[in-house]
From Swiss-Prot:
<feature type="binding site">
    <location>
        <position position="174"/>
    </location>
    <ligand>
        <name>dCTP</name>
    </ligand>
</feature>
<feature type="binding site">
    <location>
        <begin position="101"/>
        <end position="106"/>
    </location>
    <ligand>
        <name>dCTP</name>
    </ligand>
</feature>
<dbReference type="InterPro" id="IPR036157">
    <property type="entry name" value="dUTPase-like_sf"/>
</dbReference>
<feature type="active site" description="Proton donor/acceptor">
    <location>
        <position position="129"/>
    </location>
</feature>
<dbReference type="GO" id="GO:0008829">
    <property type="term" value="F:dCTP deaminase activity"/>
</dbReference>
<dbReference type="InterPro" id="IPR011962">
    <property type="entry name" value="dCTP_deaminase"/>
</dbReference>
<comment type="pathway">
    <text>Pyrimidine metabolism; dUMP biosynthesis; dUMP from dCTP: step 1/1.</text>
</comment>
<dbReference type="GO" id="GO:0006229">
    <property type="term" value="P:dUTP biosynthetic process"/>
</dbReference>
<comment type="function">
    <text>Bifunctional enzyme that catalyzes both the deamination of dCTP to dUTP and the hydrolysis of dUTP to dUMP without releasing the toxic dUTP intermediate.</text>
</comment>
<feature type="binding site">
    <location>
        <position position="119"/>
    </location>
    <ligand>
        <name>dCTP</name>
    </ligand>
</feature>
<comment type="similarity">
    <text>Belongs to the dCTP deaminase family.</text>
</comment>
<feature type="binding site">
    <location>
        <position position="162"/>
    </location>
    <ligand>
        <name>dCTP</name>
    </ligand>
</feature>
<feature type="binding site">
    <location>
        <position position="148"/>
    </location>
    <ligand>
        <name>dCTP</name>
    </ligand>
</feature>
<keyword id="KW-0378">Hydrolase</keyword>
<feature type="binding site">
    <location>
        <begin position="127"/>
        <end position="129"/>
    </location>
    <ligand>
        <name>dCTP</name>
    </ligand>
</feature>
<dbReference type="GO" id="GO:0033973">
    <property type="term" value="F:dCTP deaminase (dUMP-forming) activity"/>
</dbReference>
<dbReference type="Pfam" id="PF22769">
    <property type="entry name" value="DCD"/>
</dbReference>
């Protein structure tokens, strides 16, 4: 069940959902707007010939932050990691979904590639996967609205919420834009080879 504005306010007032810093004026009819922090992780393309999720590539990205009140300029075709200004904390019976802002999407800014889901029990900054699919550079201003958080109530509280030891929870408590930790539990299923002569239709 998607929570309405009154449900979101009630959950925040009760302390079950925490947004820090919190501005009540950011609540929408069925979501709450989240804002952009000032730090970004930029990919260092010259350091590796390829990206491999199976191994740690410690210096694949570099943390950068514009000085003062300057914007970060995202160029056409560029992909960087950013993060929300807000630290988001969810209880065991609520999951979140981060959606982009329509007004920014119409300018060619994608807020996330695939990772818009937020597990019950999560606490931390939400890492953003920012892409510019427009033909002109886009200025990203610190503190601007960058996305909207929708909240969904589970049928029952999660038996093992995010942060439980059973799941590892690689991003619990993350601060700022956090690079991929896929290598920590990278697994592969056995995939049978295709017999000779069976390639193609």
């Amino acid at each position: 069940m998607l929570l309405s504005d009154r449900d979101i306010r009630a959950e925040i007032t009760a302390g079950r959902v925490r947004l820090d810093p919190y501005d009540e004026g950011l609540i929408q009819p069925s979501s709450v707007d989240l804002r952009l922090d000032r730090a970004f992780r930029v990919f260092q393309n010259h350091r590796y010939s390829h990206i491999d999720p199976a191994v740690e590539q410690e210096d694949l990205t570099e943390l950068v932050a514009p000085e003062g009140d300057e914007p970060f300029v995202l160029h056409p075709g560029e992909f960087v990691l950013g993060s929300t200004l807000e630290v988001v904390t969810l209880p065991e019976d609520l999951a979140g979904r981060l959606e982009g802002k329509s007004s920014l999407g119409r300018l060619g800014l994608l807020t996330h590639s695939t990772a818009g889901f937020i597990d019950p029990g999560f606490s931390g900054h939400v890492t953003l996967e920012l892409s510019n699919v427009a033909t002109l550079p886009i200025k990203l201003w610190p503190g601007m609205k960058i996305g909207q958080l929708c909240l969904f109530r589970l049928s029952t509280p999660a038996e093992h919420p995010y942060g439980s030891a059973i799941y590892g929870s690689r991003y619990q408590g993350q601060r700022g834009p956090t690079p991929s930790r896929a290598y920590r539990d990278f697994t592969r299923a056995a995939v049978p080879e295709i017999p000779n002569g069976s390639h193609g239709a």
